[in-house]
Amino acid sequence: MTNLSDQTQQIVPFIRSLLMPTTGPASIPDDTLEKHTLRSETSTYNLTVGDTGSGLIVFFPGFPGSIVGAHYTMQSNGNYKFDQMLLTAQNLPASYNYCRLVSRSLTVRSSTLPGGVYALNGTINAVTFQGSLSELTDVSYNGLMSATANINDKIGNVLVGEGVTVLSLPTSYDLGYVRLGDPIPAIGLDPKMVATCDSSDRPRVYTITAADDYQFSSQYQPGGVTITLFSANIDAITNLSVGGELVFQTSVQGLVLNATIYLVGFDGTTVTTRAVAAGNGLTAGTDNLMPFNLVIPTSEITQPVTSIKLEIVTSKSGGQAGDQMSWLASGNLAVTIHGGNYPGALRPVTLVAYERVATGSVVTVAGVSNFELIPNPELAKNLVTEYGRFDPGAMNYTKLILSERDRLGIKTVWPTREYTDFREYFMEVADLNSPLKIAGAFGFKDIIRAIRRIAVPVVSTLFPPAAPLAHAIGEGVDYLLGDEAGAASGTARAASGKARAASGRIRQLTLAADKGYEVVANLFQVPQNPVVDGILASPGVLRGAHNLDCVLREGATLFPVVITTVEDAMTPKALNSKMFAVIEGVREDLQPPSQRGSFIRTLSGHRVYGYAPDGVLPLETGRDYTVVPIDDVWDDSIMLSKDPIPPIVGNSGNLAIAYMDVFRPKVPIHVAMTGALNAYGEVEKVSFRSTKLATAHRLGLKLAGPGAFDINTGPNWATFIKRFPHNPRDWDRLPYLNLPYLPPSAGRQYHLAMAASEFKETPELESAVRAMEAAADVDPLFQSALSVFMWLEENGIVTDMANFALSDPNAHRMRNFLANAPQAGSKSQRAKYGTAGYGVEARGPTPEEAQREKDTRISKKMEAMGIYFATPEWVALNGHRGPSPGQLKYWQNTREIPDPNEDYLDYVHAEKSRLASEEQILRAATSIYGAPGQAEPPQAFIDEVAKVYEINHGRGPNQEQMKDLLLTAMEMKHRNPRRAPPKPKPKPNAPSQRPPGRLGRWIRTVSDEDLE
C-alpha cells in the first residue's frame, strides 16, 4: 500500500492512478495475482464540427480494451450521424491476450477557429448515465441533463474553450482479466482466414419472443411485402451471436420467405446484416421450421449497436396481382454479447454534447488509459512481467474512499479547470501521511480521517505475527494518520506523526510472547542468546529489525539539542533542533548507525551512549544510559528516528539524564528538559533556547529548565525537583509561561547533511559565549551588538538575517529601511503596538490557547458546583463542552466518570406531558385571533392552537409558533364572512394650493381668461 522507505509520504498508488490517470498506471492491489505488465495508452483525436455546430461524443469509460468511445455529428434534420470510433493509439489485441482497465481520463475541448471566425463560441453538456446507451430516452443537448439526478455525474454549459474532463471510476472490484479478442493461428485453405479468441465470461444475453401466433396477411406485390417480425433494443460494441428458431404455418401454396437480421446503430443506420432464410418455400398445412445460429465478429461492429430487428419479405411464386398471401409465425431468438456484462463494458456511459460551435472548428479529444496487460506468447519472449501485490489495506482504503465519493466531491465529469485545481486535493487523498489541509478547507477532512482509521488496522488481521506491534501502536493510530488528534489525557502529543508501521507491509517475525509491549520493547535488541526476558526470539531475524520504524514503549526523559551546519569555524549556515530521549541501559541497537559506538563517561564511571567522547560528563549516575533521537511522543511510547544524527557534544541533556537517574520513570516524561547541571547542583542556562522551544512545541511538549520561558523550574537541582510535577496527570496542567511569539518560519525543517564535525554546541563555543558576555560588560558597543544577536536568536531569524546580509553587503537596503521606520510614539506605532510605541507586538491568543482557556473556565465552573470529574482534559475530549444531563445523572448514580461524547440517554427521565384544558386553549386562541369585540376564532384556528399545545406538552407557543399562528389568523380573517368590517381609514387633508409668487406691484399678472 505504501512506500516504507519514504519518511514523509505514504502514497496509495492505485487510488492515485484512479483519480489522476496521467500519473501513470498502478497494479490493482486485489487478490487476482497474475503476471502482467503495466501500460499507459493515449488517445488523441481532432474531430471536425459539422454544419449544424452540434455533436455528441459517447464514451465507454470502463471498457477494458482499445475502444474508448464514438463521435456523432448532428444533421439539419435533428438526427445524429455516426462519424468515427475513438480508440487507443495502439491496437491492444495485436500484442496482448488479456487486459484489466486500471484508470482512464479523457478531455474534450476546442481551441481552434476556422477561417473567418474570430471568437470561440459554443458550450458543452456532459453526463454519466448509469445504464446502457440504448436505454437513453432523450439524447438532445438539453435532455441529456435529465439522464441522472446525481449532481456529481453531470455538468452543464461549460465553455467549449475551457473543456470538460471525463474520469473513469470503477463500478466493481476484484475482477478478473478479460480476453481481448486477439488473433490466433488459423489453419485453412485461405491464408486470409482470421481466427480470434474472444471473451466468453460474463456474457449479456437478450431473449426476444414474437407475439403468440403472429398473423400476416397481405395481397401479392411485385418484389414482395416487407414486415418487421422482431425489434428490440440491445447494446454491443464487440462480437455477438444470434440464435433461435421460427415456425411458420400457411394454407396458401407457393409462399416464399426471405428473413434478414439487421443490427442498427445509435444513429439509426444499419451496421451489419445477416440472412436467416433466402427463398425458403413454405409447405401448406404443416409446420415449417426455420432455425438459425449466426456469429458476428468484432470487425463488423464498426459503431455502437443499440437495436436489432428481423425483417420478413413475403412473396409468391407465380403470383398475380390480387393473390392473397397469409401465414402464422411463432418463435424466439437470443442475442449473446460476449463480455457485455463485464462491469464497465457497456455501462455506465458518459455522453458529452456540444452545441453552437462554429462550423469547421476542431474539437480535440485527448486522454490516457492505464491497463494491466498479459502479453501474447510472442511478445512475452521480450517483455518482463511481474506479479501484482496483494495489499488489502490499499484496496479497502480505495473502496471506502470511492464509496463516499459523493460526499467527498469526487465526480465523473468535471470542468477541466476545476479538475486541474483538484489535483492537489487528490494527492492528499492518496497520501496517508498528508495533513489534509485542502480537504479541511472543503469540509472533507473528518470523513477521510474516519476512513483512514478503518483502513489502517488491516495489518493486524493480515499478518498475525505482526499483531503485537499493531496492538502496541493502537493508542497512537490518530497520530500515525498524520494529523492532530487528542490523546487520552486531552493533549495533542504528536501532531506530525507518520503512518510508518501501519501500512500492511510488516515483515513476519518469529516471536512468541503474551504481551505486545514486551515484544515491541525487545524487538530491536540484538541479544547474545536467543532468550531475552523470557521471550523466545531469533537473533537472525532481530538483526534486521533495525530497518523498521520502531514504536518503543518504555520510560524516557526528553531534551532538545541544537544542530548546525557550518561554512567556517564561527559562521552557521542553517540552524535546526532535534528531540532526544534518555533510555536506561545499553541500547545501541536503537540508535542510528551514525551514533553507534560513541559514548562519554560520567563522574561515577558509567557510560552515556550517543555522546561524542569529549571529556567527562559532569554527573554522577548509578547506571548506563543511551541517548536516541526521536520523531514523535505518545502517551506511553516514543517513535525512534532513523535520521543520520551525529553524536552529541555539550551539556544540554544533563538535566534530563539526572532526572532519569533519580526517578527512573516507567513512561516517557511529556515535558522536554534543558539545562546544564554542574557538579555543584546548579542548573545553568543554555544557548539557542528559542530554537529548542520551537522543537518542543512542534511535538506538543512544554520545555522545562532555567530561564523565563515555558516552565521556570529554578536555578538549582533542588528547586527543579520541588517545582517539577512527577505525577503524569499533572504534566498537561503545566502552564505555558511567557510563551514567545513564534513566526511561521519557526516551524520550518531544514535538510541538513549532518556529520559529527558539524555539530556546533561544543565547550569551546560555550566558552566563547561567556567571553563575549564578559566583553559586553566592558564595551557598550559590543553590548549592543550582543543584544542584537540575542534578539535575532530569540525570535528565530538568525538564518534569515544572515541570508539578508549576503544580499546586502553594504547595508544600503538596511539603512533605507531604518531611515523610513516609524518613529517612537507615532500614530502608526500607537495603532500597531499601543500607547508605548515600542514593545512586543500585541497578539490575541492562538486557537489552541483560546480553546484551552475555555476548557479551563468550564472546568472551574463545574468544580465550583461539586462536579470534580470535569477536568479540562475531560472537557476537551467532550467536544469542549461541559457535562450533559445524562452524563451528570450517570455520575450521580454510579460515581463513575462518564465517557466523553456519550449522552447516557437512559439516565435522563422523559419529559412529562402536560395536557392543557379546553378553556385554556380557547382563551389563547381568542387572544391570538383578535382583540375583544371582533369575531370569535373559528374552530379550525382553535384546532391549530390545540396542536401547538400538544406539541409543546401543554405549554404555550414559542416565538416561531406564535408568528405562524398570527399569519394563519390573518389568512382566516380575510376569508371569514363574519369578521368585523374594517374601520374606514381617515383621509389625509388635501394640500393647500401653492400661493403665487410675489411679483412687483406695477406688474400685472396674466390669467387664463386673458390668454383666451
UniProtKB/Swiss-Prot annotation:
Residues carrying the site annotation Cleavage: 441-442, 487-488, 494-495, 501-502, 512-513, 755-756
Key word RNA-binding present: no
Comp. bias regions, Basic residues: 975-986
Active site: 652, 692
Keyword Hydrolase attributed: yes
Enzyme Commission no: 3.4.21.-
Ranges of residues in domain Peptidase S50: 513-755
Key words of the record: Capsid protein, Host cytoplasm, Hydrolase, Metal-binding, Protease, Serine protease, T=13 icosahedral capsid protein, Virion
Pfam families, per database record: Birna_VP2, Birna_VP3, Birna_VP4
Coiled coil stretches, renumbered: none
GO terms, molecular function: metal ion binding; serine-type peptidase activity; structural molecule activity
Region (Disordered): 970-1012
Gene Ontology cellular component annotations, sorted alphabetically: host cell cytoplasm; T=13 icosahedral viral capsid
Function of the protein: Capsid protein VP2 self assembles to form an icosahedral capsid with a T=13 symmetry, about 70 nm in diameter, and consisting of 260 VP2 trimers. The capsid encapsulates the genomic dsRNA. VP2 is also involved in attachment and entry into the host cell by interacting with host ITGA4/ITGB1.
Protein name: Structural polyprotein
